């Protein structure tokens, strides 16, 4: 079957045990799409939302890479492992003497800006080599702490020694490390036993589909599962252009805001999504110094 020029966003519910790249390749084969990419790696041991971008949507995948993420996670108190999750060897065990009130208090202390030391079992590179390669060789290298932001952190359930929480966090946050640090704050250590991503920027797991469901579907049913390209941009203010302005915009011309029928509700230097009079997405622009400057164009008007 010939590859198709398909534009849109697939909200995939990735299963445990499959890498993000393997999930992307399976979806790409099912859709027979020419161009596809994912929006940030989800570890094989994690499940949940993995947005996949097809065609013109790939132009905006970076926006989701930078977006906040939401996860539901379960940690087991009293046990530390080499990897910070259930795959690692046990380092030590400690008594769990805290109660639910102490757990809630500990979670509250991690809301806001925090400093995390990246785990040794991670893909971050040192001298061109991923940290996990050093870790597998029994080596530990010095890592600098990185500032991340925990937007929200809520207790879902507490059945000690297991604690399930929901976290919304900035790009670059390691939930494994968060669980370990919470365990240390409680004086007993912890490791992650479950991780499920439920949100990426404005996108949620609620409308996601599994690979098994896609396997069983017809091509038309699969195509109907695709969200439009602008699903990635729903948090941006929008502006509509008449036919003449739309033509100029698609030729990369900067437009004076005074030429528009309605000025976009955007902060100075803010990004806006741009449509023509028929509500077709033309691209993304920046509104700055009285001018609407094209940033990325959608060539199909998808």
UniProtKB/Swiss-Prot annotation:
Enzyme class label: isomerase
Keyword Isomerase part of the UniProt annotation: yes
Q: What is its EC number?
A: 5.4.99.25
Any single GO molecular-function term of the entry would be: tRNA pseudouridine(55) synthase activity
tRNA processing as a keyword of this entry, yes or no, is yes
User: Keywords on this record?
Assistant: Isomerase, tRNA processing
Known catalytic reactions: uridine(55) in tRNA = pseudouridine(55) in tRNA
Pfam families registered for this protein in UniProt: TruB-C_2 (PF09157), TruB_C_2 (PF16198), TruB_N (PF01509)
- The entry's active site is 43 (nucleophile)
Q: Which cysteines are joined by disulfide bonds?
A: none
Q: Which InterPro entries match?
A: PsdUridine_synth_cat_dom_sf, PsdUridine_synth_N, PUA-like_sf, PUA_sf, tRNA_psdUridine_synth_TruB, tRNA_sdUridine_synth_fam1_C, TruB_C
Picking any one GO biological process from the record gives: tRNA pseudouridine synthesis
Its family remark reads: Belongs to the pseudouridine synthase TruB family. Type 1 subfamily.
What's its job? Responsible for synthesis of pseudouridine from uracil-55 in the psi GC loop of transfer RNAs.
What protein is this chain from?
A: tRNA pseudouridine synthase B
Mind giving the lineage of the organism this protein is from?
Bacteria, Pseudomonadati, Pseudomonadota, Betaproteobacteria, Burkholderiales
